[in-house]
Structure formats: C-alpha cells, structure tokens
Amino acid sequence: MTLSAWIILVTLAMASVLTPEDNVRLRRLTAYVANADASIVLLTYTEYEEGTNHGNSMLWRINDPLEAEYPFDPDDISLLNAERVCPELVGVGDLQYSTHNQAFYFTAQGPDGTSQVYSYNHKLETCTQISFLPISVSNLKVSPKGNSVLFSAEIFVYPNNHASVDDPLNFAHDEFARIQARPYKAFAYEQLYTRHWDEDILPSQYRHLFAARLERSSEYDDDYVRITVDNSIDLMPRFDGDCPMRPFADASSYTFDSHGRYVAFVTQVGSTAAFYTNDSIWITDLQQFLDAKKPVRDVVLPLRCATCWNKARDQRPAFSYDGIFLYYASMDEEQSESDLLRLRKQNVSDLFEYDCDSLFCGPVTGEGVFNLTAGVFDRSIGQFIIPTDSTEDSIYILAEDHARTNLFRYNEESSTVTRLTYNGTLGSLLYLRHNKIFLATMSSYTRPTDLVMLDLTVATEFTATRDPSDTMKDDLIKISYLTDLNRQRLRHIDELQEPEEFYLPSKSFPDQYVHSWYFAPANLRDSHEYPLILYVHGGPESPWANSWSYRWNPQLIAARGYGVLATNFHGSSSFGEVFQKSVRGNWYSYPLEDIMDAWSNIYTHADKAYLSREKVCAMGASFGATFMNYMNSHVNNVTCYVTHDGVFDTMCNALETDELFFPVRELGGFLLDEQVDNQQLYEKWNPARFVENMSAPMLVIHGQKDYRIQVYHGISLFQALRLRGIKTKLVYFPTQSHWVWQPQESLFWHTQVFDWLDTYL
C-alpha cells in the first residue's frame, strides 16, 4: 500500500467527509418566484433517484418566509413552513407571478408529454393547465398587466414554405413527426450552426419567441384561460435566428415594458451566430395583437432593431418605467464572448418613427447612447434590476468580483458604484418593491445553493479599490437564509472547510496581484506528508469562484487527503478588464507563470510544511485541459496529469469547434485569413506540436457529445501518448458533453480520477 493510499484510508476513517455520492444526492435549487410582498414563495428543486440519472423537479410553497427565524428546526425538511404543491406534476420550471392576476404561472409536462403552461391558484391550492399547444414551450414570462405571456418554442423556418411562417407551431409539430418517420437519419446543411454545445440542430430549426393572450373565452363552459395557436403569434417571423440564443440564454433575453405593450428581445439574424457575436435587441409593438379579434396569428406587428448599430453582443434588455429608455448590457468587441459587458442606456421613444422596410430598421449609429458603467466599473455586468419605486437614482447589479458574484449599487446621477456584498456567489435577483428587499439564490464553497433575503435597509457605504489589501471582506447589507435544502443530506459531514485565499504580486504586470484559493487536506495529521493538486480552471476567461459545484468541486479532492491549489491566473474574469484580456495571444505564458509562482509560494507557508514537493498532480478541464496538454511538455516536475475535454491540436480546433468566433479573439484572428503571424500564433500554443516532449502519466477524459472541443482531440492525445510509451488512460463518455452532468456518469468520473491520483500520488 502506498503512503497516499494509507493517508486516504485514514482520512476516510477518521471523520465523515464529503463524497461524490453525497454531492449527487443534494437537492439542487432550480427556480423560485414570490408574490408582491413575499408572503408566498414558490420554488422548485431537483433531486435524483438513487442509482439513476432520473431527476425529479418538485414544486414547493413557502408561506411567510420573511418572518421566519434562522437557524431552522433540524427536524423539519429544511424548508420554512413548506408544503408540496401539485405533486402529480413533473418537469416544473419557468416560475412566474402576476400581481395583476394574483396568480402564479409555470411550465410543466402535460398529459401528452409536451411542456405546457400551468397556473396555480394559491387560495384554492390548485394547478390548472392553461396552454394547449402542439409542441413544447419554455422560458415563460408574464406581462405586467397579466393579459399576455411570452414563451419560446422550437420551430422551422423554410423561406419557400408559407406554412412554416403562417402556422409555425402546427407546422413544427408535423415537421418533427415527418423527420422522425423518415427511413433515413441523414441531414443536409447550408447554414451554421450544425450543432451547438451538446445539441444536434436540424436544418432550418430555430428557437422563436411567441406571445400569447391570457384571456377567458365564452367558447368553453368553464372559466379557465386557454392559450392556443389561435391566440399565439410568432414575434420574429422568418427570422433565421434564435431567441433565446443557444445554448444557455434564457427568459432574461426578453422583457415587457411596464404597460405590457412593447417587447424587447435579443437575437441574431442571418445564420452567422457561429462566427459572429452580433446579438442585437429588437423591439416590437404588441398593441394590434392585443386588440385583434381571434385568430391573431395573421396580425403583422412592427419591428425595429434598437442596437443593430453595434456589431458586438447586446444582452438583458430592460425598459425604464416610463418606457422612454432601454437599458441593456453590451460589449464593444466584435467576435468576442469575453469582452466586458457594460451597462448602456438608449432612448427608444422615437424608434417606431423610423420609416423603412428593412428588417434591420433602426438607428445606424450609437449617437445618443449612454455608456453608464464605462470607465467607472471595471467588471462585467450580469443581471441588473431597476427598482420602479426607488427614490434614489439607483440600479442594482450582479457582477463577478474577486472570484465571487457580488451585488452592487450603481447611482446613475453620480456615476458611482458601491459594492454591497462580498461572501459567496449570488444569482436570480428578485426585487420586492414594497419592502426594499431582494430575494436571491446564494452558494459558496461550503454551502450548496439556497434562497436568501438581502435587506437593503441596513446597507452602509464602501467603495472598492484595486488594491487587494483594501478588499472588503464583509457584506454591507443583511443576508438571511430562507431555505436550508440540504441540511439533512449534509448533517453527517463533520465539516466543509472554508478555503484560504491569498494574493501574490504579478511577476509580469506591475501593480497587479494574482489570487489563489487553497484547500487543506481533510483530517490533517502531524508528521504526515500530503500530495498537492494544481487545479486549473477553464475559460480561460472565468475564475475559480466561491460557489458550489456538482462537478469540479475542490472539497471532494481535499476530502481524499490532497491539498488543492486553485489559482486565478491572468485571464480569469472578476479581476478587471486588463487582467482578463491579458491572456489573449498568451494562452500559457502568463497563466503558467502565475500557477508556478503560487505553487512555489505555497511551500513557504509555515503551516503547510506537510505538503509534498515530489507528489504533485495537475488537473483541468476545457481550457484547463488544453493547458494540461501543453504543460506536460513544458514542466518536468509534475507527477501526473488529468486532462478533461481539452484541445490537442489548435489548428484543427479552429474549424472543428461549434463557436468559430472563439479562437478569432483568443488567437489573434481567423485561421484562414492567410496572415502568417496569425497562423504562427496558433502553432505557438499548439500542444500537438510538443507531443515529443510529453513524459508524465496522463488521464485523458472526453465526451462524445462535446461539440465545443471534439472528442477526436481526446482520442488523438491518448493514442499519441500510447505510441510514445507514456502511461495513459482514456475515459470516454458516449452520452456526455463538455460537462459530465448526469449523476451516475459523474460517479464513474470521480472513481476514475481518484484511482488515477491514488495510483501516482
């Protein structure tokens, strides 16, 4: 038995530590919504059946959560005053509340297996199906007046087939059935994408945004609202584009104005989304649709493009309360997914005065556009909320900051930004206007996602600086937990350790600091030596953030008796624009320098004398795996590697990857531009070019459904190592994508990784 194996056995025997089995059993909060005063909260969470990949999405109701006291009774189900709602429904999501209608709305699987719209009457405690559409719908959003809804659906757009435009929902139902019944499975493509992330996209298949009226009809004996094809309309007819954009955009891609008349939505037209990031915001006027007699699908609505003047990405549209201004998050760089998103404001009151027939009708320049956060906020804008009742001129923003996602207040009058939170990662803000309170989701390295309340009435002032020594370490508003979903599932765990974090001065950039997290091995024993794991994140423009992970969770590695060093090297987001963009064209130079510096420094910590200098393994996924493939040929004192879904050949990947724009920004231009310097940069950072220098054992992991980095990269790397006599193993997932997301597959992943680490460390 090796020393490392003995340490692991002792570690597991001494105390109950987090295991992969524990992690996949956790309840995963997926959505929530509250009524106006938060006296009722509906939420859904998913938990997986033991030994399967089948997850159940359950709907719960919490009464008066703001009046509860924390901590909770350990004998309850870790939900305050909670009760299960409509347990017969499965696949629940897209939770909405209409103040006007005093009703909740959501999507769930209907009797025919499609996802349909339901309403929940909280007084009668009944759920009622209200949409009867031929295909599934998702990304539900209810208008402020409660008289209409928005939803998305997968349809087909054939330019020469009028039925696909005139009756898109019924046509899509029939077309999916026709394709399924064909005796062959082949397709012919003329447009990009052919596939995206892990999805095979059919020719001419698009995700379109629809509006439907919420109205009661005298055609039926009951008093139920019904959504049908007769009162639904495609808001982007003939568009060869998606809304929400694939693969991860959601209902934040569109919004109503405060009166429910105008809708702003994000899409990209022209089948160029694989090579360009020109996602723009269109606005349409629903008035004719709301006034028309049924059927309404023949109504032609006016469309104007508010931001087609900007050739970069625009996201998250939101109207001012008076409807005069459109706020949105926007990038400046074309063909970029990692530019900072800045908050912009644009007058759209005269948008429909533009008289033109072009689909792109609208402003042709950015004249009159206000760049609100440019020059005053060196972070990328995430979700933002404009309180309609605020006496202050404030906008509340979620943004990545110092490896967290924090809440900020932006004062439009003074152009100042105040950080309000610091601990953990926030998401899914919901503003309760009468209470000056936010609800939000929150997680950290020590706690899976729960629902929290953010009380703005106790906020104090703090303005952040770039100097990490001045970084605020405490929240400036009161944060209270409203749920503790996994108390029972984690109660046997002795401790989830709070990681140490430290900054080191950058060797290449004066006045910059490089941040690292460190997780100590669980159950440390005096006089024992423990191996070290170098944890390398993907992106490269993303950080190791203080949030819970169901996949690459450093707590699981530390629980096995390994120290874990996770460095946020140059390129990591949340540390400012200059720091983030420095990785472009420098894929391994600055990151390797930062990682090596943190690695060397960790041994100078007097309290870490237990760390081995000889037993060190490096592991990473995506860009982190690409980094592993390069590092193995350039660093000779790493014992072993784990590389998950990484690029082996940058030249091939430039034309294989689904998002063709990605290497354009990262590596200085498109591979086929015939720029000699550009091609040399692709070759400079090409791991395949240095394969003859690889020597350390390498565990290669790849998913067949990974369309970001094709499976051939993993197979090629594995075969190259084998042919060179280097110890290696290929772990192949036929059903997984860029991520291993199914619980049983994840357990197998962890078994293989732990076996590899235990063998070589």
Curated annotation (Swiss-Prot):
GO BP annotations listed: proteolysis
Induction, per UniProt: Expression increased in response to the protease inhibitor bestatin.
Signal peptide: 1-15
GO CC aspect terms: membrane
Keywords annotated in UniProt: Aminopeptidase, Hydrolase, Membrane, Protease, Signal
Covalent S-S links between cysteines: none
EC number: 3.4.14.-
GO MF, one example: serine-type endopeptidase activity
Cellular compartments annotated: Membrane
Listed InterPro entries: AB_hydrolase_fold, Peptidase_S9_cat
Function: May be involved in metabolism of dipeptides or may affect host defense mechanisms.
UniProt record similarity statement: Belongs to the peptidase S9C family.
PANTHER family, per the entry: DIPEPTIDYL-PEPTIDASE 5, SERINE PEPTIDASE S9 FAMILY MEMBER
Name of this chain's protein: Dipeptidyl-peptidase 4
Organism name: Giardia intestinalis
Organismal lineage: Eukaryota, Metamonada, Diplomonadida, Hexamitidae, Giardiinae
